[in-house]
Structure formats: C-alpha cells, structure tokens
Amino acid sequence: MTHEELMTLWKSEESIAHIKGWDFSHIGGRYEEEDNLPWDYEKIIRGVLRDEMKLLDYDTGGGEFLLSLGHPYENTSATEGFPPNVQLCREKLSPLGINLRECSDASHIPFADESFDIIINRHGDFDPPELHRLLKPGGLFITQQVGSDNDRELVEAVLPGTLKPFPHNDLPEQKKAFEDAGGFVVDIPGYEQPMELIMVKGL
C-alpha cells in the first residue's frame, strides 16, 4: 500500500475506535499480550470481599468488572469521570441501586469520611491521603496499575522523546506515598510483560 492509502486506512480506523467502558473488542486479535501476571486482581478482591462490606470502585469504566463481582447493590458505589462512560454507567448501574458519582479528581472523591470497607481501582488515578480519608479503620485499597514505563520501547520508536504521561507511577514512589499517608500496610508487587502488535491498527 502507498503512504497515502495507509494514512487513509489509519484515519478511518481512528474515526471508529470510540471505546466505551472496558470494551476493547474493536482491537481484538490485533495484538498479543501475555496473561500470566503473578497475581489475580479479581481473585484477590473476592478473597476479602464480604456481602456486608461497603465497596467503592473508583474509575469503574463501564462498570463491567464491578458488576461481575456480584456484590449487593445496596452496598456498592462507583465513580467515573470520562463523560461517555458516565452516561453508560447511569444507564447500567444507577437503575440497579448502585450509588454512582461523577468524579474525575482522585483527590476530591464525593463521599463522606470512613464510608468504605474496600476501595478497588484498576488502571485509574488515586490519591493515598484521600483513600485514607474514605476508608473505615482496617479498610482495604486494592489496585492494579500500569507503570510509567509501560510500552516505553514502542513510544520511543514512534514518538522519540515523548514525555511519560504518568512519570510518578512507579513502585518506589507509590510505596512511599502510601506510607506517608499513614495507616497503610503496603504490599506492592510488580511485573513486566511483553506485548506484540499484530497489526498497526492495534494502536
């Protein structure tokens, strides 16, 4: 294909790649990523979650993972800040009785002090002092994150010199932030895994 044809194809892909919630089916089969993390985010949560506990899923996306937990709706809360996902959550979560709040500022989450037994967060922003405020004594924060060096080799190949979007999202710095917030017993494992692009459209 010529350069012009490729550009036309890629722009066409860009125009239709509007992801809602946690649905990445549009790029299914276009990349491969090892799925052998030394932990299981869902299993960890299920291992400690009890029906009577107050649960918050911060940055819930489209609520897909939250709903998969099957937690009693009256004890379930969620936040989301991306407008298309907020609307999606209003349609999916609110009618069930889940307490949904629109929020895009991890330092000012609109819930009262000591509201939750467990706060979960997958790939969303977070602020340790705010988490400390929201959690009941003995409460838990469980998160799975992407580090500041995620896909760095690819970024440098395509856009050399691009600044890291989340330069502080690394294990030593985050460990210290939680310790400084007080009240946290920190267990932060890390893992690096490769990703292989099958098609440029997977970007």
Give the residues covered by each predicted segment:
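Conserved S-adenosyl-L-methionine
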Residues: 183-194
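Class I SAM-dependent methyltransferase SAM/SAH-binding core
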Residues: 54-108
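Short alpha-helix
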Residues: 166-182
